[in-house]
Structure formats: C-alpha cells, structure tokens
From Swiss-Prot:
GO molecular function, one term: structural constituent of ribosome
Region (Disordered): 125-151
UniProt keyword list: Ribonucleoprotein, Ribosomal protein, RNA-binding, rRNA-binding
Organism phylogeny: Bacteria, Bacillati, Bacillota, Bacilli, Bacillales
Coiled-coil region(s): none
Gene: rplC
Task performed by this protein: One of the primary rRNA binding proteins, it binds directly near the 3'-end of the 23S rRNA, where it nucleates assembly of the 50S subunit.
Family to which this protein belongs: Belongs to the universal ribosomal protein uL3 family.
HAMAP family listed in its UniProt record: Ribosomal_uL3_B
Protein name: Large ribosomal subunit protein uL3
Protein's organism: Bacillus mycoides (strain KBAB4) (Bacillus weihenstephanensis)
Subunit structure: Part of the 50S ribosomal subunit. Forms a cluster with proteins L14 and L19.
GO biological process: translation
Length: 210
C-alpha cells in the first residue's frame, strides 16, 4: 500500500548525521491534509484516496467544490490530489493525514512542477553539442539536420528549440532524513522539483532500489 501527503517546498539546507556526515536536504512543509474521498475497486475500478491541502476562501469556490468538501466536514481546499493504491480501509473521509505517516529512513518519490526556463535552444533544452566556434565555421548552436530529404517534412518529435521547464517531474528514491511533527516538516535528502513555495506530492517509493 502506498502512503502520501501534499506539501510546499520551503527550500534547501543541510544537517549533520550522527557520524558527522553533512547531508543536503530539502525542507517540505506538509501541514495536515484532509481525506476528501475514498475510491475503491468496486465503485471506481481502482483504490485511491483524495487529499485536500490548504484552505481556500469560499468566495473563490463553486457549488460543486463546496458540496464535495462539505461531505468531508471541512472547508474548500486549494489543492486536491489523488494517492493511488493507498490504504483505503485504514482511512476515513474527513480524517487528517499528517507528517507522522512517514518516518526517518523511509524512501519516497517526490513529484512537483519544474522551474520554468522560458524559450531555450537545443543545447540547454536537450543537451546537444555545439559546433566549432572558429576556423570559418558558421555552425555554432544550431539544432542540426531536420531529417532526410525524401519525406519533405520535419517529423513530429524532432528536438528543437522551445519553451523549457514547467513540466511535472518525479524524483524517485529519496530518503527522509528527519520528520518534525511539531512544525509539520519533512527533511528529504537531496533536491526536489519546483521553485520555493511550490506544491509537491510526497509518496512512498514505487521502485525501491536494493
């Protein structure tokens, strides 16, 4: 069974392990989430829980949103996400999910929206190599060949310049270094996707490396 929680990325810092090792960590503020809905194989074809995170002003919500959260006896939520294959039987609608669901040493996957980089060329966007910069070369940072002559067109999927970033990215197999239950904080080893204050979803790892 998978467990998960929604939170906001605060930023990065570093902590010391007991053996003196310096560990870079990302701080995630995961205030209590509320279970808004339970989905089961019988009713929906799969098992999942729907979590709501951060209160939203009622003025900014529509009637369906208000009715949906009212069933869980809570206020409208700004962010709503599903955690698939969760422990449906162990949770009830309206119940709070806190950082205590995780413990130090657990391995998790963290999903977020990557930082937007704007319009970028193929070298930065796709990691292509540049051409010679001197000796009469006129090919420096271009995308290269557009493909064979015969099709008379450029195939879909050709790696070209374009808008970079702003994509959903999941970093797998990150270790939880510390869980601060008093301040609702998770300290995760390494970096996670997204800018500061952006939404992240922390879930139990799907592919735990042995």
């Amino acid at each position: 069974m998978t467990k998960g929680i929604l939170g906001r990325k605060i930023g990065m810092t570093q902590v010391f392990a007991e053996n003196g090792e310096l560990i870079p960590v990302t701080v995630i503020a995961a205030n209590p989430n509320v279970v808004l809905q339970k989905k089961t194989t019988e009713t929906d074809g799969y098992n999942a829980i729907q979590l709501g995170f951060e209160d939203k002003r009622e003025k900014l919500t529509n009637k369906p949103e208000q009715g949906h959260t009212a069933k869980a006896s809570t206020t409208p939520k700004r962010f709503i996400r599903e955690i698939r294959d969760a422990d449906v039987d162990g949770l009830e609608v309206g119940q709070e999910v806190k950082v205590e669901v995780f413990a130090a040493g657990e391995i998790v996957d963290v999903t977020g929206i990557s930082k937007g980089k704007g319009f970028q060329g193929v070298i930065k966007r796709h990691g292509q190599s540049r051409g010679p910069m001197s000796h009469g070369s006129r090919y420096h940072r271009r995308p290269g060949s557009m493909g064979p002559v015969a099709p008379n067109r450029v195939f879909k999927g050709k790696k070209l310049a374009g808008r970079m970033g702003g994509d959903q990215v999941t970093i797998q197999n990150l270790e939880i270094v510390q869980v601060d239950t008093e301040r609702n904080l998770l300290l995760v080893k390494g970096n996670v996707p997204g800018a500061k204050k952006s939404l992240v979803v922390v879930q139990g790892a799907v592919k735990v490396s042995k």
